[in-house]
């Protein structure tokens, strides 16, 4: 979901796949080698460098959005085998507060937990979209990136998405701090 782009604290590549830095005109791009032709059809390009995913691990990057200062090291490349080369660039953004794969990578790399969506599902005051339901800012985020010249592509993907069975509103994966009591340790026999 585009709304999680502004919550991303890392990028993730597949550790064993091949990635390339290519030059197209005056611009350079890093993406999975297997996806170059898909992303640059009928385009002349020069391969400047080749990498295995692990070569990119811990390389730092400049975030697209930086509404808060994370309390831990952020904005670097991580590796995980869940990243596939079926579409996109072979590089995914990681927002540990939104999604099981992202949360797992976040724990593995000790990434900061950035939560800019409140308990009602609305963007918080740190963002320009304060008070707006997070799914309603998807288009605005893409427009913002395009206006700044930072949107490479935004293809429409058809995939299943969870909706509330009662009111038909989109559901969001929302991680929050919780605690549990192991009652078997405190219960009298």
Located regions from the model:
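Short cysteine/histidine-rich zinc-coordinating motifs and their immediately flanking basic loops
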Residues: 158, 176-180
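A glycine-biased structural micro-motif
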Residues: 49, 53-58, 129-139, 147
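The substrate-binding groove and active-site-proximal loops of carbohydrate-active enzymes
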Residues: 91-93, 125-134
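Phosphate/diphosphate-binding loops
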Residues: 133-161
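Cys/His-rich microdomains that often coordinate metals
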Residues: 171
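NTP-handling and nucleic-acid-processing catalytic cores
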Residues: 2-120, 186-189
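Short Cys/His-rich metal-coordination motifs, predominantly Zn2+-binding knuckles/fingers
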Residues: 167
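Short cysteine-rich clusters marking metal-coordination/redox-active sites
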Residues: 164
């Amino acid at each position: 979901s585009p709304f999680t782009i502004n919550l991303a604290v890392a990028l993730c590549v597949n550790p064993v796949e091949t990635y390339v830095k290519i030059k197209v005109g005056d611009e350079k791009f890093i993406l999975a080698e297997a996806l170059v032709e898909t992303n640059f059809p009928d385009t002349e390009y020069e391969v400047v460098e080749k990498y295995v995913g692990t070569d990119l691990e811990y390389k730092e990057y400049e975030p697209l959005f930086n509404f808060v200062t994370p309390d831990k090291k952020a904005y670097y490349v991580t590796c995980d085998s869940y990243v596939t080369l079926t579409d996109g660039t072979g590089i995914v953004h990681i927002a540990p507060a939104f999604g099981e794969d992202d949360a797992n990578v976040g724990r593995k790399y000790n990434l900061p937990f950035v939560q800019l969506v409140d308990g009602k599902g609305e963007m918080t005051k740190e963002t320009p979209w304060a008070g707006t339901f997070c799914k309603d800012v998807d288009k605005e985020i893409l427009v913002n990136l395009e206006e700044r010249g930072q949107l490479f592509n935004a293809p429409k993907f058809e995939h299943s998405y969870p909706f509330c069975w009662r009111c038909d509103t989109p559901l969001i994966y929302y991680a929050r701090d919780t605690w549990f009591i192991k009652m078997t340790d405190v219960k009298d026999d």
